[in-house]
Amino acid sequence: FLSLIPKIAGGIASLVKDL
């Protein structure tokens, strides 16, 4: 489960950068 946190955080960060 802990290994998914960086993936989710990275995905959200990339989405915010696109905005």
From Swiss-Prot:
Subcellular location(s) of the protein: Secreted
Record-level GO cellular component terms: extracellular region
Keyword presence, Secreted: yes
Keyword vocabulary terms for this entry: Amidation, Amphibian defense peptide, Antibiotic, Antimicrobial, Cytolysis, Fungicide, Hemolysis, Immunity, Innate immunity, Secreted
Organism domain of life: Eukaryota
Modified residues (Leucine amide): L19
Tissue: Expressed by the skin glands.
Gene Ontology annotations of biological process type: defense response to bacterium; defense response to fungus; innate immune response; killing of cells of another organism
Post-translational modification: Phylloseptin-1.2TR is amidated, whereas Phylloseptin-1.3TR is the name given to the non-amidated form.
This protein's record includes keyword Secreted: yes
Signal peptide bounds: none
Chain's role: The amidated Phylloseptin-1.2TR has weak antimicrobial activity against Gram-negative bacterium E.coli ATCC 25922 (MIC=100 uM), Gram-positive bacterium S.epidermidis ATCC 12228 (MIC=100 uM) and against fungus C.albicans ATCC 24433 (MIC=100 uM). Has an anti-inflammatory effect, since it inhibits the production of the pro-inflammatory cytokines TNF-alpha and IL-1 beta, and induces the production of the anti-inflammatory cytokine IL-10. Has an activity of stimulation of insulin release, which may protect the species from being eaten by predators by causing fatal hypoglycemia.
Assigned protein family: Belongs to the frog skin active peptide (FSAP) family. Phylloseptin subfamily.
Protein name (Swiss-Prot/TrEMBL): Phylloseptin-1.2TR
